[in-house]
Amino acid sequence: MDAVLEPFPADRLFPGSSFLDLGDLNESDFLNNAHFPEHLDHFVENMEDFSNDLFSSFFDDPVLDEKSALLDMELDSPAPGIQAEHSYSLSGDSAPQSPLVPVKMEDTTQDVEHGAWALGNKLCSIMVKQEQSPELPVDPLAASSAMAAAAAMATPPLLGLSPMPRLPIPHQAPGEMTQLPVIKAEPPEMSQFLKVTPEDLVQMPPTPPSSHGSDSDGSQSPRSLPPSSPVRPMARSSTAISTSPLLTAPHKLQGTSGPLLLTEEEKRTLIAEGYPIPTKLPLTKAEEKALKRVRRKIKNKISAQESRRKKKEYVECLEKKVETYTSENNELWKKVETLETANRTLLQQLQKLQTLVTSKISRPYKMAATQTGTCLMVAALCFVLVLGSLVPCLPAFSSGSMTVKEDPIAADSVYAASQMPSRSLLFYDDGAGSWEDGRGALLPVEPPEGWELKPGGPAEQRPQDHLRHDRADSIHETTKYLRETWPEDTDDNGTSPNFSHPEWFHDRDLGPNTTIKLS
């Protein structure tokens, strides 16, 4: 074991025996009082109720019936309400986790002045510290008590102990009873509290994770609090050092006699709360309870300071971000204004260019459009001329009655019976006279023989004049009915070629060239 032990006077603590009878102790007693590592500290809270019983069992053992002067102190277990020290003490797990906060360091010589019980089997070690009395002689048999706890879990109650090598003990004057200020290296997970000035409040550590609201949660009695092993602080001595702790080290409250040195913060808080300031050990129950309450308030104060510090840092960070974003926004606005100005300038230049281009190119376009229209008109005129030249080549059409002219020689065959019945269109000429006139020309009727005509009268000359006048019209009338086929039977409104009277022919001298033949 690496624990440094301070020898006890064996002739007074263990008279007549060279070993410690551990028959009344069992494995659970040592485990319940063991100081577990950081990741097992939550087991300690459930097992702290057995710590006072274990500590009292060392002195209630039958071997120790003869009490010495050192054992005349009060060994009564504290009240249930204050079974544990506060979680913000040096033995708790509420050490400041911030690496920026300086931590109080004590010299390793403090460990030499105190003895320790150590469990070297598994997890922990139990150290029992006792201040050396200058008038008591040093006995090498005291070292044998350090080996009793090492084999308590694996051996019978009675154990053979072997002496351990001891480190040299610093020399003290016979009348020197006060404890000198020392510096001790502690691990960063141990609770360290600093007394700082108001301007240093920003550098307070973060809120301890093990702070609780209950009165006895996370606290231990000063006399039942086991200090940590001196080997662990030696390995972690690289932490920062400060010179003004806010709370008194818990191992200083474990002494059974001697003066009690409290920090200025604790004294001020005790006075403010109306409690008396304890000056010597051991502490009474009332003093212990008051001191516990004061330490808890100091810890809450530290937590509040840390919370304010974090909030202040957060607000400062936000303010810096706001300033940065504001500057970036202003720069972006300037860029936007520059781009808008450039855009307006480019638009003006574009309008000027469009005006110039329109003024120079519009005239040729108009001329080209005029030339195109002229060409189209010329092409249309040429087409009309060509079409007009082709019109005389077409067959001639009559513009008046649209009648068909035929040779007069074919007039004799007008009423020839056709071999096949057919229909023909009838054309009527308004200027050619009525149909009855033509009919009269075709069928002239001579007056009866009894008519007397005066020579040279109008009645005598009328037939000849009429026939001469209608000669040309008869030819025209016959052409209107070319190849006309008359039906055999017609109605009353029609005209049939079959007359009701017998056909008769009458020859009349109408002229040398006039011949009328009816068939």
Curated annotation (Swiss-Prot):
It is a single-pass type II membrane protein. SMART domains: BRLZ. This is Cyclic AMP-responsive element-binding protein 3-like protein 1. A motif (S1P recognition) lies at residues 423-426. Residues 332-353 are annotated as: Leucine-zipper. One of its GO terms (biological process) is regulation of ossification. The gene is Creb3l1. It comes from Mus musculus (Mouse). Residues 292-321 are annotated as: Basic motif. The record marks L426, F427 as: Cleavage. Induction: Up-regulated in astrocytes residing in or close to CNS lesions, such as cryo-injured cerebral cortex and stab-injured spinal cord. Up-regulated by ER stress in astrocytes (at protein level). This induction is accompanied by increased proteolytic cleavage that releases the N-terminal transcription factor domain. Induced in astrocytes upon DNA damage. Up-regulated by BMP2 and RUNX2 in calvaria osteoblasts. This induction at the transcript and protein levels is accompanied by increased proteolytic cleavage that releases the N-terminal transcription factor domain, possibly through mild ER stress. Residues 290-353 form the bZIP domain. Residues 210-223 have a biased composition (Low complexity). There is a cross-link at K184 (Glycyl lysine isopeptide (Lys-Gly) (interchain with G-Cter in SUMO2)). A motif (S2P recognition) lies at residues 392-395. The keyword Acetylation does not apply. Its main location: endoplasmic reticulum. GO terms for cellular component: cytosol; endoplasmic reticulum; endoplasmic reticulum membrane; Golgi membrane; membrane; nucleoplasm; nucleus. Belongs to the bZIP family. ATF subfamily.
